[in-house]
């Protein structure tokens, strides 16, 4: 019997068409310059019309439709390859968030029907929960299944050491929880997400989930200590900031140089008011990149 998920009391089994990602949002513009040396903090201003995360959307100056079509095909190819290689019967699966994971869930559902697989799925967001329900998969949570066999998720950027930036869709904390309690964490992405260094291709910053009352002091602390710009992420289809599934705000830290990411991640997480960061350091075991030529490039964690 399927156990109701954590959102059942508030939302019920809502099977409406899925959004491309939870809490679609844009970076906040305008605001005050705090005058910090070598850095500044953006307070919320008018929201830009900019699609975030790995959804592949863009503003008027974005990629041509042909490029986007190739990227979508690449996502699908990477997702299906990862599912074929790693999903097995009697597993507890962590289901990530975003547009790439849609292809993975579709293939998982096909295999469940074709092979009569017995799988249990743990969502990383409201969007992931609805996706699991839409495709008729078995929904559960960490209360019932605290040990996860395999987590599959996308990424906004992957560096040469398989460090990740995640959280463009605002689900970073629950994504990190699920990945952290999984025996194996596999990432699926398209060719645009493959970088030598974090920040080479992803220019929207590292997301930081914060308690709402602390967003200003956290913004100042991060900018003062590490430089760059810190912005409160503003919503597109609502007035005010993006609110996560956990009821928190998101800051986007646009760093201006390469850092020792493990040290930076620890330091930011120790800042009072910070819930977690979108830096996934030393967590991914393998990344599947769908390429423009129809191939899949598989990179494993260096030892």
UniProtKB/Swiss-Prot annotation:
List, in alphabetical order, the Gene Ontology terms for molecular function in this entry.
identical protein binding; monosaccharide binding; ribose-5-phosphate isomerase activity
UniProt keyword annotation of Metal-binding present = no
Q: Which reaction does it catalyse?
A: aldehydo-D-ribose 5-phosphate = D-ribulose 5-phosphate
Q: What gene does this protein come from? A: Rpia
Sorted alphabetically, the keyword list is: Isomerase, Methylation, Phosphoprotein
Which named protein is this?
Ribose-5-phosphate isomerase
The cross-references to NCBIfam families, in alphabetical order and at most eight, read: PRK00702.1 (NF001924), rpiA (TIGR00021)
* Location of Omega-N-methylarginine modifications: 52
Gene Ontology biological-process annotations? pentose-phosphate shunt; pentose-phosphate shunt, non-oxidative branch
PANTHER family the UniProt entry points to: RIBOSE-5-PHOSPHATE ISOMERASE (PTHR11934:SF0)
Spell out the family assignment given in the record's similarity comment.
Answer: Belongs to the ribose 5-phosphate isomerase family.
């Amino acid at each position: 019997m399927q156990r109701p998920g954590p959102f059942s009391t508030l939302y019920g089994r809502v099977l409406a068409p899925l959004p491309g990602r939870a809490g679609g949002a844009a970076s906040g513009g305008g605001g005050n310059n705090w005058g910090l040396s070598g850095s500044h903090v953006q307070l919320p201003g008018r929201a830009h019309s900019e699609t975030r995360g790995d959804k592949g959307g863009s503003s008027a100056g974005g990629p041509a439709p042909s490029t986007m079509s190739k990227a979508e095909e690449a996502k699908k190819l990477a997702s299906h390859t990862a599912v074929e290689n790693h999903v097995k019967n009697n597993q507890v699966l962590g289901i990530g968030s975003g547009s790439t994971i849609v292809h993975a869930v579709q293939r998982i559902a096909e295999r469940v029907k074709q092979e009569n697989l017995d799988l249990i799925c743990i969502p990383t967001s409201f969007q992931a929960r609805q996706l699991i329900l839409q495709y008729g998969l078995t929904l559960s949570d960490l209360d019932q299944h605290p040990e996860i066999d395999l987590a599959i998720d996308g990424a906004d950027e992957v560096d040469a050491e398989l460090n990740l930036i995640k959280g463009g869709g605002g689900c970073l904390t629950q994504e990190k929880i699920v990945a952290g309690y999984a025996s194996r964490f596999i990432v699926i992405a398209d060719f645009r997400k493959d970088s030598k260094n974090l920040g080479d291709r992803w220019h929207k910053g590292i997301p930081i989930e914060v308690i709402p009352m602390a967003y200003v002091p956290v913004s100042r602390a991060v900018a003062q200590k590490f430089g760059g710009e810190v912005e409160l992420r503003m919503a597109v289809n609502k007035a005010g900031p993006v609110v996560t599934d956990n009821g928190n705000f998101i800051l986007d830290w646009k760093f201006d140089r390469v850092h020792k990411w493990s040290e930076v991640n620890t330091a930011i997480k120790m800042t009072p008011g910070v819930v977690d960061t979108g830096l996934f350091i030393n967590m991914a075991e393998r990344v599947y990149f769908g390429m423009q030529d129809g191939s899949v490039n598989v990179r494993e964690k260096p030892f």
